[in-house]
Swiss-Prot record:
Pfam families: RBFA. SUPFAM superfamilies: Ribosome-binding factor A, RbfA (SSF89919). InterPro entries: KH_dom-like_a/b, RbfA, RbfA_dom_sf, Ribosome-bd_factorA_CS. It comes from the Bacteria. It is found in: Cytoplasm. The gene is rbfA. This is Ribosome-binding factor A. Keywords: Cytoplasm, Ribosome biogenesis.
């Protein structure tokens, strides 16, 4: 039962954070950020939000991370007003490398296909 609740909360946080980033956060450093997943601890006290960006540049990734860190307070307070839970979890943002990894695999497969 607890895992079911955690799963629902993860989906709800992902949906709400995506909406908040699109509509409430005005920082240009976080434009183009896609929330790819959320992991919430079993006690619902901490949430790790995984995101991806379209740019491959390291400087862009650093700027995005700084923008998200700066906006964490706003995002958490908005989540608190939108979610019906006792305590809003602490938020941490981590860049999701799986999108970049997947595109690299696609490039390698295309190269192999063109060599044949």
């Amino acid at each position: 039962m607890a895992q079911y609740r955690v799963g629902r909360l993860e989906q709800e946080i992902q949906r709400e954070v995506t909406d908040i980033l699109l509509k409430r956060v005005r920082d240009p450093r976080v434009e183009g950020v896609t929330v790819t997943g959320v992991e919430v601890t079993g006690d619902l006290q901490q949430a790790t939000i995984y995101y991806s960006i379209l740019s491959d540049k390291a400087s862009s990734a650093e700027k995005t991370a700084a923008g998200l860190k700066k906006a964490t307070g706003l995002i958490r307070s908005e989540l608190g007003s939108r979610l019906s839970i006792y305590k809003t979890p602490e938020l941490t943002f981590e860049q999701d490398g799986s999108v970049r990894y997947g595109s690299r695999i696609d490039e390698l497969l295309n190269d192999l296909h063109h060599q044949d």
